[in-house]
């Protein structure tokens, strides 16, 4: 029989083993589509971002007008920018659902895959933050000022660190230049980390909704999941294009239509919607260093989840108490997101503090306890 180039060629066989002949569990649901959707998001963002970078000028005097020029005078520039800005939102929707899936079905027990995933999330957050500064509108400028200023809470070296990051004594031209450089670089770092993430995943194979070993019942990735993924792409790209074409500014802040002005502070400084939950946790502690630590902990707590798994079963599929707790956590995150968008006044302050406390209590205390309790219930 003639050798199959797909299986013998050094490069093609890597593609083959990852995307074609990969053994996949036969029962993985649509919740397993988000990994490939994140891949499409990354490709779309890099492509649109590259096209935008060709028309962008990273200079405080020109940045705002270069973005306006792109939207007005470049062929389909408005579309490219709208796809890029809203693509970021879809990227975060997909990654949050992807993490939620991993949490629900116990996928975090693949520790290397999970940890590289958390690093990917942190890198994505950094990329989105520096990218938001580039149009150099009011919210870009003040968002950059507020968030970079948080590093000054670090004892002893804080202030030096902030001035080093700024390249001066305030957010100014050097800051914008380096943020553009970082925003160009980080997505390629994300692409590299994604390959590491997939390498670790393919060592163990995918988890499945039952949380049990599925080696006895595997099916090839192609054609089954290639087709299913293409359906997923269509179902994601449809709302993305709808949003970009019909209401591109729905998720943005009107304040960013005003060019950056260091002398005028916007009435409510707030980040894009996908950072609001963390912003609410930051604001809920009336102390700068404490708030910064809580902000960091809100994401870094994900590194601890594999060690807090006390249940004998992997997935929550047959654990109703953990399921209830999981959905309370989801509701709690929605509350945090909403509180983060509100001004700092009564009753939002106390709601934010309670929601922040609940967030950490559920993740660090209640989940392990309920897991252990469910183990006991298995005996009855």
From Swiss-Prot:
Q: How does it sit in the membrane?
A: Multi-pass membrane protein
Which of UniProt's keywords are assigned here? Electron transport, Heme, Iron, Membrane, Metal-binding, Mitochondrion, Mitochondrion inner membrane, Respiratory chain, Transmembrane, Transmembrane helix, Transport, Ubiquinone
The protein's location, in the record's own words, is: Mitochondrion inner membrane
Stored InterPro entries: Cyt_b/b6_C, Cyt_b/b6_C_sf, Cyt_b/b6_N, Cytb/b6-like_sf, Cytochrome_b, Cytochrome_b_C_euk/bac, Cytochrome_b_N_euk/bac, Di-haem_cyt_TM
* Cofactors that this protein relies on: heme b
Q: Which residues of this UniProt protein bind heme b b562?
A: 84, 183
> From which domain of life does this come?
Eukaryota
Q: According to its UniProt record, what is one Pfam family this protein matches?
A: Cytochrome_B
The family database entries (PANTHER family) matched by this protein are listed as: CYTOCHROME B
Summarizing the function annotation, the protein's role is:
Component of the ubiquinol-cytochrome c reductase complex (complex III or cytochrome b-c1 complex) that is part of the mitochondrial respiratory chain. The b-c1 complex mediates electron transfer from ubiquinol to cytochrome c. Contributes to the generation of a proton gradient across the mitochondrial membrane that is then used for ATP synthesis.
Q: Which family does it belong to?
A: Belongs to the cytochrome b family.
Per UniProt, subunit arrangement is:
The cytochrome bc1 complex contains 11 subunits: 3 respiratory subunits (MT-CYB, CYC1 and UQCRFS1), 2 core proteins (UQCRC1 and UQCRC2) and 6 low-molecular weight proteins (UQCRH/QCR6, UQCRB/QCR7, UQCRQ/QCR8, UQCR10/QCR9, UQCR11/QCR10 and a cleavage product of UQCRFS1). This cytochrome bc1 complex then forms a dimer.
Protein name in the entry: Cytochrome b
Organism name: Puffinus nativitatis (Christmas shearwater)
Q: What is the lineage of its organism?
A: Eukaryota, Metazoa, Chordata, Craniata, Vertebrata
